Amino acid sequence: MSDQALSFLKDFLAGGVAAAVSKTAVAPIERVKLLLQVQHASKQISAEKQYKGIIDCVVRIPKEQGFLSFWRGNLANVIRYFPTQALNFAFKDKYKQIFLGGVDRHKQFWRYFAGNLASGGAAGATSLCFVYPLDFARTRLAADVGKGAAQREFSGLGNCLTKIFKSDGLRGLYQGFNVSVQGIIIYRAAYFGVYDTAKGMLPDPKNVHIIVSWMIAQTVTAVAGLVSYPFDTVRRRMMMQSGRKGADIMYTGTVDCWKKIAKDEGAKAFFKGAWSNVLRGMGGAFVLVLYDEIKKYV
């Protein structure tokens, strides 16, 4: 195996393992966030049964659906996240060679910054093309609030994918893809671009204290998450459309979804669950730092 292939494989494994561990740890926060985001577009949650906020959601989930339901959809998320994060990190370095070849970070700061933004955004968009159906299934499984098998919309990951594919075809599994690409480019650009730029400005980027790394990563994930959050809300709402027919369809398209949320629920609705997203972002920050630490030993 060539050095290049070995380096790619190390990136793939380090990124994937770090991501799988952190995602499972923050899965309950992720599910609360998703429910708050999509409950207005759910056929299972009537207006009077909607969650009032994070605390109400955290209290009611174990009571109504059982404690383990906090991890509903987590298998899809781990399966999805392993290739997503691993491909992101692996492609990030390939894209960095394209966008940053021969750029001096101290003498050409803005070109260096722009190159980092471009490489981070391109890496995120590329990997999304491969794993979007898993992202879709993760959202639909997390939004499924039925308690027993009879009340559930889907029995599991395979059932969700096959049911929607039979109903809507491949298009159904890629519902909301366009707005996802927009959001992911904005998020990843900040996530990787600002993180790498900040680390690159330090005197000795190769030997940064783990606490400093974590603090930089924490700030980056919180800011990136909030900036791209409205795009995430719209894409999740669009995902909830798949499998619906006729009068059940809430939004005719992405633009209609943006308009209706703003008109019917107000601008605040775009940020429903955003606070839990900041908490979940701690897991994202942990991934960046853990990835750097794992790479030192492989």
UniProtKB/Swiss-Prot annotation:
The keyword Coiled coil does not apply. The keyword DNA-binding does not apply. SUPFAM superfamilies: Mitochondrial carrier. It holds the Pfam family Mito_carr. The modification S-nitrosocysteine is found at residue 160. The modification N6,N6,N6-trimethyllysine is found at residue 52. The modification N-acetylserine is found at residue 2. Residues 38-74, 131-178, 232-273 are mitochondrial matrix. The modification Phosphoserine is found at residue 7. Its main location: mitochondrion. A motif (Nucleotide carrier signature motif) lies at residues 235-240. It catalyses: ADP(in) + ATP(out) = ADP(out) + ATP(in); H(+)(in) = H(+)(out). The modification N6-succinyllysine is found at residues 147, 245, 272. GO terms for cellular component: membrane; mitochondrial inner membrane; mitochondrial membrane; mitochondrial permeability transition pore complex. Residues 1-7, 100-109, 200-210, 292-298 are mitochondrial intermembrane. The matrix-open state (m-state) is inhibited by the membrane-permeable bongkrekic acid (BKA). The cytoplasmic-open state (c-state) is inhibited by the membrane-impermeable toxic inhibitor carboxyatractyloside (CATR). Proton transporter activity is inhibited by ADP:ATP antiporter activity. Monomer. Found in a complex with ARL2, ARL2BP and SLC25A4/ANT1. Interacts with ARL2BP. Interacts with TIMM44; leading to inhibit the presequence translocase TIMM23, thereby promoting stabilization of PINK1. ADP:ATP antiporter that mediates import of ADP into the mitochondrial matrix for ATP synthesis, and export of ATP out to fuel the cell. Cycles between the cytoplasmic-open state (c-state) and the matrix-open state (m-state): operates by the alternating access mechanism with a single substrate-binding site intermittently exposed to either the cytosolic (c-state) or matrix (m-state) side of the inner mitochondrial membrane. In addition to its ADP:ATP antiporter activity, also involved in mitochondrial uncoupling and mitochondrial permeability transition pore (mPTP) activity. The transmembrane helices are not perpendicular to the plane of the membrane, but cross the membrane at an angle. Odd-numbered transmembrane helices exhibit a sharp kink, due to the presence of a conserved proline residue. Belongs to the mitochondrial carrier (TC 2.A.29) family. This is ADP/ATP translocase 1. It comes from Oryctolagus cuniculus (Rabbit).
